[in-house]
Amino acid sequence: MERTLSIIKPDAVAKNVIGKIIDRFETNGLRIAAMKKIQLSKNDAAKFYEVHKERPFFNDLVDYMTSGPVVVMVLEGENAVAKNRELMGATDPKEAKPGTIRADFAESIEANAVHGSDSLENAQKEIAFFFAQREIL
């Protein structure tokens, strides 16, 4: 059984579509093993997205991710990483297939509603960033 990290980003939290997004995960066979709503600090966001540190969009990404609360979740299920990425849709909502989370709820490539781990290895690191083992049930 795989686990992956999902973040409902500030734009989607502000639009009050948390429940609708969670429903997509649960309807498609992913179980929520852990979940919390948090406000990221600039330091937290910079550390989490450190891999993008040298990219031109890094500072805007950190600002955006700290602009409001986020919901972080551990999703569990068969092929959880791939299934979550399929449900999210393309990074740019204009390119996302109809019926995907980003096609339905994202505003732009910057405010694209959700984050999902891109590999099992990164999922483990990202889950550990937000959750203690005892919080994952």
Swiss-Prot record:
Active site positions, chain numbering: H115
Catalytic activity: a 2'-deoxyribonucleoside 5'-diphosphate + ATP = a 2'-deoxyribonucleoside 5'-triphosphate + ADP; a ribonucleoside 5'-diphosphate + ATP = a ribonucleoside 5'-triphosphate + ADP
Signal peptide per UniProt: none
GO MF entries: ATP binding; metal ion binding; nucleoside diphosphate kinase activity
Cofactors (names): Mg(2+)
Keyword terms of this UniProt record: ATP-binding, Cytoplasm, Kinase, Magnesium, Metal-binding, Nucleotide metabolism, Nucleotide-binding, Phosphoprotein, Transferase
Superkingdom of the source species: Bacteria
EC number(s) on file: 2.7.4.6
Record GO biological process: CTP biosynthetic process; GTP biosynthetic process; UTP biosynthetic process
EC category name: transferase
Locations listed in the record: Cytoplasm
PROSITE patterns for the chain: NDPK (PS00469), NDPK_LIKE (PS51374)
Pfam families: NDK (PF00334)
Sequence positions that bind ATP: K9, F57, R85, T91, R102, N112
Membrane-spanning segments: none
Subunit: Homotetramer.
Known role: Major role in the synthesis of nucleoside triphosphates other than ATP. The ATP gamma phosphate is transferred to the NDP beta phosphate via a ping-pong mechanism, using a phosphorylated active-site intermediate.
PANTHER family in the cross-refs: NUCLEOSIDE DIPHOSPHATE KINASE (PTHR11349)
Family recorded in the similarity comment: Belongs to the NDK family.
Protein name per UniProt: Nucleoside diphosphate kinase
Organism: Nitratiruptor sp. (strain SB155-2)
Lineage of source species: Bacteria, Pseudomonadati, Campylobacterota, Epsilonproteobacteria, Nautiliales
Gene for this chain: ndk
